[in-house]
Amino acid sequence: MRSAWLDIPLADYEGHMAVPGVGQAEMLATLFAELLGQWTPASAAVIGCAGGNGFDRLRVDVTRRVVGIDINPQYIQELAYRYAAAIPGLELYVRDIQEPVERIAPVDFIYAALVFEYVAPKPVLQNLRSICRPGGVLATVLQLPSDHASPVSDSPFTSLKGLTSAMQLVSPAALAADANEVGFRFLSSRLLRLSSGKEFAVQAFERWRP
């Protein structure tokens, strides 16, 4: 089945995420920077990297290798244009993370924010395990159900409405259970709340199973 993400221009996606009533771009970039500061990985992968939101906050003297993975080739092309010169250790891949990930060396830290709402979680967790070093960390962000906001927020960027039918919220407990089954040990969880009323669960897992 064709991914809905292939039909959304990057400008629309970034514009939507930056709309004040949505406010998710700044939240996700800030969280990415915080997690990098917490774990100080020498290598990191961003799943669903789009145009590189938060890549400007990377400390390349600490995180020397950065892997970006996205299903949309236009997103990857724009990310390369923006950051290839600024991040010497940048590796970019056009991949469907629901398929086995091949020829990508494992990393110390994986950031998968607002990814699991659009994929089958368990197979993706298995694929992410293959690119996470033993002892490495997987950080996830899940959107939680809301009585006050629709899953895909209203904005002038109508192409985003195409995501509505593809989106399915995942409970943090279900993700943690799937993660444990494939070899990711639960470390922590916390809640983020935006002014729009939307809430997000931030979870961290450690790859422990050989």
Describe each region flagged by the PLM.
Residues 1-39:
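Class I SAM-dependent methyltransferase Rossmann-like catalytic core
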Residues 43-99:
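Class I SAM-dependent methyltransferase SAM/SAH-binding core
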Residues 98-110:
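A short acidic, Gly/Pro-enriched loop at the edge of an enzyme's catalytic core
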Residues 108-122:
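A short SAM/SAH-binding and catalytic strip from SAM-dependent methyltransferases
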